[in-house]
Amino acid sequence: TILVSFSDYKIIDKELAHHLVDIGEIVFFLLGAMTIVELVDSHQGFRLITDKIKTTNAVKLLWILSTITFFFSAVLDNLTTAIVMAALLQKLIKSREQLLFFAGIMILAANAGGAWSPIGDITTIMLWVGGQISLNIIPAIIIPSAVCIIVPLIYVSFKYRGQNIKRPKNAKEEKTRDVIPYERNIIFTLGVLGLLFVPVFKTITHLPPYMGMLFSLGFLWVVTEIIHKGKDHVHKHSLTVPGALSKIEASTVFFFLGILLAVGSLQSGGILNSLATILDDLIGNIYLINIFIGFLSAILDNVPLVAGAMGMYEITSTGPYAIDGEFWEFLAYCAGTGGSLLVIGSAAGVAVMGILKINFIWYIKKISFLALIGYLAGAATYILL
């Protein structure tokens, strides 16, 4: 698309450099988060959660995990939470079909949870930093966001009524059974605190989130080297950052990179900005515009769409375009949750797709309808409130 849109190679080079900077931040963030999660996993840290979840009832487990995901996303952000939940689900569910279905629901919950927090999604962070929204978005959007995940959960509760899940036998835990409890507790606690530190770091320093993530990873690296310094090299390697990095699949990162570059080419070609202008001219109604942006975000990614909307509309002192105005609040909801309609429509979806190898067509058949009814129900709730 870039080659078609620009005949001057200098412009192509400039645009590519611009997008690689933005995409690089997301990729480094993803690498840092995945490494921390893998480090916690290698120390059996997730057993602190999985051992407390005793139920094998599919419906009850779905509600428990969705609730955890919904609120974690508001604090950690939806991408990090989705990565954590993908690792957690593999510890809880043996059946491949059930694992993928639960993962699909977690994508919905992660995106719904991220939409009502200024730090829960990259688009809400953009709107927060840009001055379009403040912490007042929380009471305004939390109910529609909750409806967005509750409606699909009610629907699938009937489908999974009476069904149970089987726990997998984890070979990895057998190999690392000599990890003592205090090591597991330390790494789990520091891993969670490290992830929670990222939005705090962003708020205090105003530096990109990936720097906070890499700082947390660096701190964990030092800690693991200290607590495992007396162990033999083979055992120590599997419990430190170099070992965790070696277990991360490069295909996941490259897949993520390819998706973002494709979207960047559409943005550089002016296609996304043209679509935003057409929406404003043809529709006009702020609710319908945002609902349509939500649908588009499932295909074209929500970041450039929100960026385009921020460039099209100036902040006013009163009305729907004021700070915390209806347009910006509803944009945060629609852009955040609309991406759930397709697995490639959100960073959380793309990450889980890569980690668990979710098929694009499978997601459309099994999850997209649930995402649609939740998205529309939440939108209707916001409009009515």
Model features per residue range: what roles?
Residues T1, D13-L48, K54-L61, Y182-F188, ...:
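Helical membrane-embedded segments and adjacent short helical loop/helix-boundary regions
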Residues D22-G32, N136-L153, I204-G218, L288-I289, ...:
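Alpha-helical transmembrane segments
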Residues H43, L65, G194, V198, ...:
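Transmembrane helical segments that form the transport core of multi-pass membrane transport proteins
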